[in-house]
Amino acid sequence: MGEILLKNISVNGNECDMLIEDGRISRIADAGTIAYDGADVVECRGKVAMPGFVNMHTHAGMAMMRGIGEDIAFHQWLDRIWEIEKNLDEEYVYHATKVACLEMIKTGTTAFNDQYWYMPMAYKAVSEMGLRALLSYVVCDRNDPEESERQKVQCQEMYEASKSWSDMVTFVISIHAIYSVSESMILWASDFARKNGLKIHVHLSETEKEVSDCMAQHGGMSPVEYLDSLGVLGEDVIAAHTLWLSDKDVEILGKRGVTCVHNVNSNLKLASGYKFKYNELRDAGANVCLGTDGCASSNNLDMLETMKTSAMIQKAWRNDTSAMPINELIEMVTVNPAKVLGINVGRIEEGALADLLLIDVGSYHFMSPGSFEANLIYSAHSDCVDSVICNGRFLMKNRVVPGEKEILAEAKKYLHRIM
């Protein structure tokens, strides 16, 4: 792995030199004070270094499904997606995942938590693109006993195969949702995850209907109460959406230390709701992060857009301009996900893994004495991301991702699978 020397880069408001060696930030010092023979020396004047974003809930294989389920109710949308997915194969998922990775790189994401099918091909795509990822084996038996048994065997086979994966990618168990997975399969999946030290990823309390149906079927228990009664919830659980919550639900999620992922654009677009209980979850002890959801529901994977919309909706529905402040927004896409990843990312400091962005502050979006973070979130767009480094390697330099045109051209050949 080659060394990189970033000259005259702004770090926390100071002009510095930064040396990257063996995938880590090895030294940060005053500008002009680091010399290193053989390093790739990059002049960074006019650019700011910040941690790469982590997208904590998405479906990368949906990257070519934008615009196919518009203006219909959530459960109609879900039925349409499931019908389309019957025609997909591993080659489609491979190319769609590469498209998703390309978009994430272009918009500043260096790691993501994915839930989709054909895991081996997703792994191939992610490895080729150079991002970090949590990739899920998705349990979704739809109460079919034969399908349950098939998935158990396949899950165990794929987990064994994953032991040869790069340490950039982590195997995760996904329980699709309580309405699509039988109780016996939920118990099996959570037990398998715990026996093997794996994270559990689940859609939870996404819609009002999910909650009312659960209460009708499970003696008045909410989805959160139901999963808790089964012993599923814990610090190893990543719960996507957690939108329709009672005070008791919030208390349980906080007490169990669950990671709750807010997917604002998907929730808004599918009219799932908007009153995400950020303050309450944070104060209860939950680890709150942000995600985009898949492109079939949110239509892009832009974490800057996600941050801006999340904050503005919080401020509006709470009638509180201080809701979801800037520093906490940044933490929700950097430091908080790092707790789940269990690695030293999310900060620009010596010894940290070199997953970082170089932000070009030369545009009118940053022509202000206001804070860099405020201008980044509320004024700029993702095209301000000039370069992306992940694990000490440039994935994008000066807005160019190697092979980008070829990735799109190859993927285009597979669009007919969803038409």
Task: Name these PLM-found stretches.
Residues 122-243:
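Metal-coordinating catalytic core of metallo-dependent amide/deamination hydrolases
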Residues 208-221, 249-254, 271-281, 298-315:
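Histidine/acidic-residue-rich catalytic or RNA/ligand-binding cores of hydrolases
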Residues 64-95, 102, 129-144, 149, ...:
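Active-site gating loops and adjacent loop-to-helix segments of metal-dependent hydrolytic enzymes
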Residues 9, 23, 46, 57, ...:
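Divalent metal-coordination and catalytic microenvironments
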Residues 229-233, 278-363, 377-380:
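His/Asp/Glu-enriched, well-ordered alpha-helical/loop segment
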